[in-house]
């Protein structure tokens, strides 16, 4: 019995050495599906560490670059001059040197008293929107201006209607600034020493 035990002990000793030799060779492990699963699992933590580090997040937007990116956007500036007599909307490029479109409330109404109305400002804004869309603009900044100086520093009634119409036009709106000129010195009102005679 000692011989059979010794004989049985010899193959048992040989089998663990073969199993230990197989993982070292590496060729049989690559073919087995069990071995490929840990490799995929090892790759997943590496991929999971990249978003945490922030390296994969900047790579994701370039994949969607053909659709829309900030580089593809064409921005302009909508200058809104609003007084109690009229509303003028002047669309330019970012430099302000090239006029894209211009319209006023007085063009869209027949009576002088309606030139500064919200309806006229909305019509003027819609005309500017159509022209800007035809020229490929995707968004713009808005600069609102009242008379300023020695006149009114509050925009007229058409300013809000014009801004709302521009916002509903489907463009991306950046900044909205009030660029009303304010005097910082002794600017003299017109009318002379005795003032305006009524």
From Swiss-Prot:
Keywords: Ribonucleoprotein, Ribosomal protein, RNA-binding, rRNA-binding. Residues 1-11, 19-58 have a biased composition (Low complexity). The keyword RNA-binding applies. Residues 187-198 have a biased composition (Basic residues). InterPro entries: Ribosomal_uS11, Ribosomal_uS11_archaeal, Ribosomal_uS11_CS, Ribosomal_uS11_sf. One of its GO terms (molecular function) is structural constituent of ribosome. One of its GO terms (cellular component) is ribonucleoprotein complex. It comes from the Archaea. Gene3D superfamilies: Ribosomal protein S11. Residues 1-72, 178-198 are annotated as: Disordered. PROSITE patterns: RIBOSOMAL_S11. Coiled coil: none annotated. The keyword Ribonucleoprotein applies. One of its GO terms (biological process) is translation. Located on the platform of the 30S subunit. Belongs to the universal ribosomal protein uS11 family. Part of the 30S ribosomal subunit. This is Small ribosomal subunit protein uS11. It comes from Cenarchaeum symbiosum (strain A).
